[in-house]
Amino acid sequence: KQAMDYLKAVPNSIIQFDPLNPKYLDVLFKMFLHPLESMGVDFFWNDSTGDMDITKLWALNHYMYLDSGKNSNKRPMILARGGVLAPHRYPVLYGGSSEISWKNLKELPFMYLNAANIGVSWWSHDVGGNHGGIEDGELYLRYVQLSTFGPILRFHGARGKYYKKEPWVWDAKTESITADYLRLRHRLIPYIYTEAYNYTRAGTPLIQPFYYNYMWVYDDDLYKNQYYFGSQLLVCPILEPKDPVMNRTIHRFFVPDGVWYDLVTGKKFPGNKKYISFFREDDYPVFAHAGSIIPFSNRSDYNNIGLPTDLEIQIFPGVSNTYTLFEDDGITSLYKEGYYLKTSIDYNYLRNNYTVIIRSIDGKSGIVPERRNYKMVFRNTKQADSVTVYFNAEKLQSNNYVDGNDFIVEVSGVPTIGQLTINCKGKDIEIDAVRLINDDLESILVDLKINTYLKEEIDSIIFGDLSYE
């Protein structure tokens, strides 16, 4: 009633919203959005704008973005269905409603890469698809896994009691795997946030098409969907359902020059080679290059969105490298005034002697926790013969142990302003964890949906060292 009176509209009529009219914007912001913000709403989604004139849609995004950042206590943020001109300037984009299907899942990497090509790193889609189609757990998981290593992870779908968007409405296996990937995404926030900063400052896209460096894959259906996720990771999306007999997805991928490691298993893949591998529903092909330094949050209280006191840093052996972690409050615009902290993580690699130096290099104190607990995870690395830890000139105690193929050094209560130095010495420290075909085959045989006697015969032919009665 108040809005109708202000606009002098005919009572009970439908108002055609016009973002080019200042009075309409007054109604939108002062009578509708600002009261909702005062109730705790963080940002708004411009949806159902498909029929709006392009100029008006651009104006709507422009004014809503500016209004959402009207004070320095909160950064501007909107989610919009259309970006129109200069789409990288304003909203996080929403790809529209798509049918739930393997066909539409296959289109998503193409959209990721094309968005990156026009400077839009923050592009989103409905995890699991939006409407229609035939839902199944495997398809849902592949949506979740792709989105875990995508710009924006966002669950959404059409209304209806038969749609299954929430992880907990699925079977126990699907729910458990989904939860693992959602926790992994949360743990990766320090890395993703730093890569977002790099995009803002240097223009380096969060998603970089693989064909930037290997142009021949552009027209190759097997490899054209691969992409770099930030500076340290390579993603080779799974877009096909599994083979019903093997209970695995048969997937081909290309590993670029150098040495690469499976992010989860740590298996080693020599580069500049094509591979074929077999992936269970809980597996996803994501690789870190030799020397990769990846910061993870190591907190157990997953709902805490503050900067973590516990930080896990995974380092893959073989090459020296430096990674600069960027942190700020994540909410306000005070980072523009220098309220942030940059922390350099230097990895100096020798086969028998490697050192990690963590030191604050730029910004202000008081941004991150005063002290931190560091868990250094040296992937595919044997236990060192000796470990020495210093903070500045003070020698510290550490907890050192082996977990599978990884060597762990834990140091607690380290001040975040200053220099932490960890030196490890040992003979032939790197574990040669090259992907073992025999391990893959044996694992596949276990899951094959064939007669068990036939499994034993196949095993005997392949391995030749087992006998059965």
What are these regions (language model features)?
Residues 219-221, 247, 280, 339-341, ...:
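Residues that act as N-cap/strand-start positions at coil-to-secondary-structure junctions
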Residues 233-234, 352-356, 407:
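Hydrophobic residues embedded in beta-strands of well-ordered beta-sheets
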Residues 290-394, 413-469:
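Accessory, solvent-exposed terminal regions and/or long lumenal/extracellular loops of proteins
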Residues 261-281, 386-412:
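Solvent-exposed beta-strand/loop surfaces of large extracellular or lumenal domains
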Residues 228-229, 255, 349-351, 402:
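Generic beta-strand structural signal
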Residues 1-289:
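Catalytic-domain carbohydrate-binding cleft regions of carbohydrate-active enzymes
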Residues 224-225, 251, 343-345, 398:
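Residue-level detector of beta-strand structural context in well-folded domains
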